[in-house]
């Protein structure tokens, strides 16, 4: 986590809050350690808190649930529930009154509730976890393939592209494909799927990698 922050030109002490989406180790692993070490406020659902089962003493711990909004400095953070195999998973949009950033990873489907929560985003980070053919041909056991592709799993490249097509692109200026599987996807496959929807629209398409993430983006509203 610290290395990734450093790549973005930040230090852990620069953080105003840490928001945990759910309890799976690849999402919550370093959050408590950083929060304790640098006295950073934590936000998560109560279900995530219960599932983590850790000692949060000495940490400013805040709970949020579907539909809640809370402030972090000048940003309004809005929580919404998603379809994932976790206790009480959430995703978030962030709004400063001028521009809105939405994030959607770790969901096996896009419900009308999710679509409404992500309305009027200027930038969207969306999960492109796997290529369907790569997953089908992978060495993963059958049960794991079913878990990944279920409605409580992850979005494929095609699912992400389908959502973008149905959701509309009128306000979007940046789309970031994220949470790519290292075994069942390739950045170029994710980008091709999104590019096919974007077409000739003036929208920047970026694919985040597990190693490098993505660079800072300046957002402006309509």
Predicted features and spans:
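Active-site metal-binding motif and surrounding structural segment of the metallo-beta-lactamase
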Residues: 1-44
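Active-site environment of divalent metal-dependent phosphoester hydrolases
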Residues: 24-28, 49-51, 86-87, 110-112, ...
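Cap/insert and terminal regions of metallo-dependent hydrolase folds
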Residues: 112-209
């Amino acid at each position: 986590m610290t290395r990734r922050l450093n790549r973005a030109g930040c230090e852990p002490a620069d953080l105003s809050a840490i928001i945990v989406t759910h309890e799976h180790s690849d999402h919550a692993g370093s959050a408590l350690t950083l929060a304790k070490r640098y006295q950073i406020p934590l936000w998560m659902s109560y279900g995530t808190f219960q599932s983590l089962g850790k000692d949060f003493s000495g940490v400013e711990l805040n709970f949020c649930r579907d539909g809640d909004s809370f402030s972090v400095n000048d940003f309004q953070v809005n929580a919404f529930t998603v379809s994932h195999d976790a206790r009480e998973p959430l995703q978030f949009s962030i709004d400063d009154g001028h521009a809105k950033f939405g994030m959607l990873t770790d969901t096996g489907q896009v419900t009308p509730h999710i679509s409404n929560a992500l309305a009027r985003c200027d930038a969207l980070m969306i999960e492109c976890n796997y290529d369907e053919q790569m997953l089908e041909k992978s060495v993963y056991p059958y049960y794991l393939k079913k878990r990944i592709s279920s409605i409580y799993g992850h979005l494929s490249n095609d699912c992400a592209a389908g959502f973008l097509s149905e959701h509309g692109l009128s306000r979007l200026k940046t789309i970031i494909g994220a949470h790519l599987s290292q075994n069942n996807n390739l950045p170029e496959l994710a980008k091709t799927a999104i590019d096919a929807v974007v077409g000739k629209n003036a929208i920047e398409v970026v694919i985040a990698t597990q190693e490098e993430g993505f660079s800072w983006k300046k957002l402006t509203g309509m």
